[in-house]
């Protein structure tokens, strides 16, 4: 579908005939497409775990009840089958991941389950990965939804992009409860929900394979006691380029205090950005209701979030990596709290990166506004728009 809005155009990813990527649990997924058939393999297996093959059936993919019949579009519904005696839900999710990476331009995909995969229907429907459309002629004709997949529907805990979740899914399946809390600082005076505790420093909080650069991107809760983390953070903040935007240059004592304050502050968490384990930059995610930005902007919800980012290493700069890092930070925010409706940021208005934010990301530049230390641009990414148009590849 067309994703052009306010200067942003999503670049489509076209997978090669044989395509390989890695899941967060290090499982290797390989898919091969030939003559319209997609076969999906795991690890070094010589036999496919899943096969999506052409089928005579077509299903309407235009929204039912919205689009007039004379405008409605239908698409062929491939048959989803397997050579396995029983395909696990974990592997079914991996197979759908591989399929979506070959159909990045689609919002929904029709599928027909056969006798080998019909047992997966409860998993697909009850998790929201798929639904049975009105024009289905059998209960095993489904539409799978891309936005649902990227929101983590049906994702196995060990393969989920969000790592070290709080609350831990093994101890609680409910979201963190809504308990009124209060923050009073120099710039903030507000009630807000009590925030969940942060994962331990050094814990990976997000991991995703970035297909455009063929590397694994991770976000790790920064650990100031980790010599590699601290040395990199200090070097980046003391560089001329980063200091223009962040203005945190100083001795080690200043950096240690900054990171200690971040660790003690429940509303904000610092993360190390890495590519295949190589440290690349630093970012922060925060609950914006009790952030100074929330005070000066106003109108933000109890669960809305904000991000900050710096790319410290020159070799990890560039459009595709920058877009992937920003997209991943937004993705992590929306995944960690399903009640988050918007994620915002406030870069300095005079930074050269600002015009590129509209071109690279599905966000709006709302306005310029004043903060005590800078004139900033207020950017907004909305949940629905993100999962419709973000470049999650």
UniProtKB/Swiss-Prot annotation:
EC number: 2.3.1.-
SUPFAM superfamilies cross-referenced by the UniProt entry: Acyl-CoA N-acyltransferases (Nat)
MF terms (GO), sorted A to Z: N-acyltransferase activity
Gene3D superfamilies: 3.40.630.30
Keyword field: Acyltransferase, Transferase
Gene Ontology terms describing biological process: ferrichrome biosynthetic process
InterPro entries (UniProt xref): Acyl_CoA_acyltransferase, Acyltransferase_MbtK/IucB-like
Keyword Transferase: yes
Pathway: Siderophore biosynthesis; ferrichrome biosynthesis
Domain of life: Eukaryota
First-tier enzyme category under EC: transferase
One Pfam family from the record: Acetyltransf_8
Keyword Acyltransferase: yes
Ranges that cross the membrane: none
Family recorded in the similarity comment: Belongs to the lysine N-acyltransferase mbtK family.
Function: L-ornithine N(5)-monooxygenase; part of the siderophore biosynthetic pathway. Omphalotus olearius produces ferrichrome A, but no other siderophore has been detected. Ferrichrome A consists of a hexapeptide ring made up of one glycine, two serine, and three N(5)-hydroxyornithine amino acid residues, the latter acylated by trans-(alpha-methyl)-glutaconic acid residues. The biosynthesis of ferrichrome A depends on the hydroxylation of ornithine to N(5)-hydroxyornithine, catalyzed by the monooxygenase omo1.
Protein name, entry field: Acyltransferase ato1
Gene that specifies this protein: ato1
């Amino acid at each position: 579908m067309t994703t052009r809005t306010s200067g942003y155009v999503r670049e489509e990813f076209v997978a090669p005939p044989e395509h390989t990527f890695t899941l967060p649990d290090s499982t290797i997924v390989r898919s091969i497409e030939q003559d319209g058939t997609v076969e999906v393999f795991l690890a070094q297996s010589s036999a496919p775990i899943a096969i999506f093959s052409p089928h005579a059936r077509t299903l309407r993919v235009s929204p039912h009840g919205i689009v007039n019949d004379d405008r409605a579009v239908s698409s062929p519904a491939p048959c989803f089958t397997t050579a396995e005696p029983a395909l696990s839900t974990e592997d079914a999710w991996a197979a759908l991941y591989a399929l979506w990476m070959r159909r990045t331009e689609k919002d929904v995909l029709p599928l027909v389950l056969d006798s080998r995969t019909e047992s997966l229907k409860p998993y697909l429907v009850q998790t929201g990965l798929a639904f049975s459309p009105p024009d289905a002629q059998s209960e095993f004709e489904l539409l799978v939804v891309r936005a649902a997949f990227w929101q983590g529907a049906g994702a196995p805990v060990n393969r989920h992009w969000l790592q070290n979740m709080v609350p831990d899914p093994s101890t609680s399946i409910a979201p963190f409860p809504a308990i009124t809390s209060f923050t009073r600082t120099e710039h903030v005076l507000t009630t807000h929900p009590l925030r969940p505790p942060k994962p331990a420093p050094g814990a990976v909080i997000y991991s995703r394979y970035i297909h455009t650069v063929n590397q694994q991107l991770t976000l790790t809760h920064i650990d100031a006691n980790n010599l590699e983390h601290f040395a990199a953070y200090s070097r980046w903040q003391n560089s001329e380029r980063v200091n223009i935007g962040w203005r945190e240059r100083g001795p080690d004592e200043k950096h240690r205090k900054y990171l200690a304050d971040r660790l003690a502050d429940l509303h904000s968490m610092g993360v190390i950005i890495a590519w295949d384990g190589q440290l690349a930059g630093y970012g922060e995610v925060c609950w914006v209701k009790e952030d100074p930005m929330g005070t000066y902007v106003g109108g933000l919800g109890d669960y809305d979030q904000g991000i900050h980012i710096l790319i410290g290493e020159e070799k990890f700069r560039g459009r595709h990596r920058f877009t992937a890092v920003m997209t991943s930070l937004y993705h992590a925010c929306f995944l960690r709290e399903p009640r988050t409706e918007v994620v915002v940021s406030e870069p300095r208005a005079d930074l050269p990166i600002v015009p590129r934010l509209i071109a690279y990301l599905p966000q709006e530049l709302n306005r310029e506004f004043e903060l005590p230390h800078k004139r900033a641009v207020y950017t907004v990414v909305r949940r629905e728009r993100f999962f419709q148009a973000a470049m999650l590849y």
